[in-house]
């Protein structure tokens, strides 16, 4: 009840109003707007309220700190300090960077933020009293729709304050039309000043630091002003004769790929292997070879010339995460080439899509023969073939000829006389 009574008796008094200009000189000129922002409906002002807690014994008044920070921010955001104007014969809306500044109002409230429930809905204070609505003398005319930003700082009795914004929707930097986020109390005032002195070594030649530049053949900037060429880079990929595989290796060694990499220190570092699972040991001991030699390995099979299986391990020193299945689909084959089968010979599913052997307890899927396509019926090779087929399909049946009719009549009477003679011979009479 006490808070409601204090909120009902709360009054907001506007102490002063003035124009805050940028603290330094800003560039001028007119900035065009987009075709959407030039519509007359976009000249509305977006309103927002921002509530901040504070202390009653603050050394600096919030309005004074925000005013100084606003003047410093307008130097970088100088279009906000301008005015909206119409230029040209068509009256297109532009931002005139005049550098006049934004409208700033300072006000006080006779209650605390707790009395008005920190401006929660429903509002206990009229929002128009917390939003900036400037009053002009009769001799001056400043239409509000030409202003880009209006700010009002209302300080409450508890030390907290409310910042009210009215921002032009046409010049809003955000899609929703909201003003830029407000910094903390005196945030811009406490920032470090920019460096005024000269930067040491700014006029010297640029220094390019590349890790392992002598091994990669990168040109390095010289201190004498020239460019010192680097050492030529060795060949990236080289084929060597396959040595004899160790006795403990599970398969035979097909070939070796020597890949020079800056981070490959002989086997442990560098890139990984495609298709190798985490924690899988090196069966062939290729990583222990000098120079980071890594082998391509596959198990022995009865048939040669098959595609490389999915568990094939290739060197991936660049870290590209290659897909082993793509190597198989690409047509990489090992061993003697296998001649193609005849077209009439059936091919099974396991020949087209080989799979790794399953576990003993798993059930092997059945292999169905590949269905052959049905042969299409060929049309007669004539220029009027479609018309002939259509006429044959819709042609009515031919009428019965006289010869066919005579044959039918003769056979009918032959069977009738045969039955009559049979009845007369055996003396069969009807009852």
Curated annotation (Swiss-Prot):
Biased composition (Basic and acidic residues): 381-394
Assigned keywords, A-Z: Acyltransferase, Transferase
UniProt keyword Cytoplasm present: no
Ranges of biased composition (kind: Basic residues): 297-306, 335-380
Record-linked Gene3D superfamilies: Chloramphenicol acetyltransferase-like domain
Compositional bias (Low complexity): 224-234
GO MF assignments: hydroxycinnamoyltransferase activity
E.C. no: 2.3.1.-
InterPro entries reported in the protein's UniProt record: CAT-like_dom_sf (IPR023213), Plant_acyltransferase (IPR050898)
Catalytic site: 169
Compositional bias ranges of the Gly residues kind: 264-273
Keyword Acyltransferase carried by entry: yes
Region (Disordered): 220-247, 260-313, 331-400
Protein family membership: Belongs to the plant acyltransferase family.
Function comment: Involved in the incorporation of ferulate into the cell wall. May act as arabinoxylan feruloyl transferase.
Protein name: Acyl transferase 8
